[in-house]
A protein has these predicted regions:
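An active-site-proximal beta-strand-loop segment
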Residues: 15-51, 57-58
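Short small-residue beta-strand/loop micro-motif enriched in glycine and branched aliphatics
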Residues: 47-53, 107-110, 134-135
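C-terminal domain-tail junction helix/linker
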Residues: 101-105, 129-182
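Basic, flexible linker segments flanking DNA-binding modules
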Residues: 1-18, 114, 169-178
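Surface/interface recognition patches
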Residues: 56-66, 92-109, 113
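Short, surface-exposed connector motifs at secondary-structure boundaries
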Residues: 49, 77-81
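RNase H-like two-metal-ion nuclease catalytic core shared by retroviral integrases
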Residues: 85-87, 93-96, 107-129, 140-147, ...
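Active-site beta-loop-alpha junctions of metal-dependent nucleic acid enzymes
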Residues: 35, 54-77
């Protein structure tokens, strides 16, 4: 029987404070006939906030590493961070593992071929594509970058309410948390 890395998240998508559980994945975006760019995004499951995202012409370990490093530079992680991903080679690569290990992060993996284990991130991509990306045809990565910025930074984090946040946006939920602990 084949063994797989452990799923430590077990579909527990509602941590009780920020920077306890982050999830990540990739999606592709067409920029012409058989041409794609790849978006890697990291969400904080407490608020559903997209805390880091990057685009690249390659879906590789460098994109995963760059996105994780961006998230770590933006956020102050205290205590143990659980980082959940699928079992893609990018997330098992030596250079990615080094960032995980150097930052004492616990890495959790979805079961192979089971997207429900990463449902929050999958839903984020679904709505990004439905509301923004699939409405246009892109010729280059710069145009995708502009629309991703518009959706993620201007709309999603600021104006998109979530039932998991009791109707609050990701930024409102985090603001309420940090104001309450002052």
């Amino acid at each position: 029987q084949k063994t797989y890395p452990q799923n430590l998240l077990n579909q527990k998508f509602n941590p009780d404070k920020p920077n306890q559980v982050w999830s990540t994945d990739f999606t592709y975006i067409s920029i012409g006939y058989k041409k794609y760019v790849y978006l890697c995004a990291i969400l904080d499951l407490y608020s559903r906030k997209c805390i880091a995202w990057k685009l690249s012409h390659r879906m590789d370990a460098k994109l995963a590493c760059d996105t994780l490093e961006l998230a770590l530079n933006k956020r102050k992680v205290e205590g143990t961070l659980l980082f959940h991903s699928d079992q893609g080679a990018q997330f098992k690569a030596r250079e990615f593992r080094k960032i995980i290990d150097d930052n004492n992060i616990m890495h959790s993996f979805s079961k192979p071929g089971y997207p429900y284990d990463n449902a929050v991130t999958e839903a984020f991509f679904k709505y990004l594509k439905h509301r923004q990306i699939n409405r246009k045809k892109y010729q280059n990565i710069k145009l995708v970058q502009l629309d991703c910025f518009e959706y993620i930074e201007n709309f999603y984090n600021n104006y998109n309410p979530h039932t998991a946040n009791l109707g609050l946006t990701p930024n409102q939920k985090e603001e309420n948390y940090f104001n309450a602990i002052k």
